């Protein structure tokens, strides 16, 4: 293994350790003064950061990397979700507030303001440790170029033989409703299914607009415009919200190979153009 590969592996191990706690929040908050800039400035030398307003194509970050292959040509390695949308778009632009430590922040779907009483009816029992009807969630289907099986955290996207993979995140924002006619999360989850030799979700959301694809990073509240994520990720974010039956994601939270049972916090929206890659 070369010296560069050793550095990459050490970096990925550090990020993986944090991911197992907060899932895709990445980061080891490096205290190296060269990496963490003074308050008010931005971190430098990194590729474009995520999340972003996908309706804006503007970005001046000069770091370029090759986009990951289509999800169908990669292995699904993790599924997790965040309370409120990390990204912003016209369809999910209602600001949830500043929150604390990544919780009670982010963006909500516009359709969440026009739900019926039946859709807002409380489900029986606890859902994923606190989800309620009317809530917005952003689901991430994480894919890797490594030959691995799905499992908990970013560690499942790596292996000893594949320490620097291509990563792709397919993304959908949902409004939770108590309606069996809404989308069933079981239809979008993973159940040991493979297609053409690749681990795949049963399906990915359709009919929610053409996904916006761009170069970005891992997300989550451990990162900010002063503390950048070092991992390079190809993002594919659908621009429209969809209604999801809250009972079905509640069932998924009870048992899944990813050991996910709750919503994760969000990273503050990245707005400085120097930290954003241009969207083609």
Identify the meaning behind each predicted range:
Residues 2-11:
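Bacterial N-terminal signal peptides that target proteins for export
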Residues 70-75, 80, 161-164, 180, ...:
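Non-catalytic macromolecular-recognition regions in eukaryotic signaling proteins
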Residues 27-42:
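Intrinsically disordered, low-structural-confidence terminal and linker regions
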Residues 29-32, 212-280:
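Long, compositionally biased interface segments
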Residues 48-148:
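Short N-terminal edge-element motif at the start of the domain
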Residues 145-222:
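Short helix-loop boundary/capping segments
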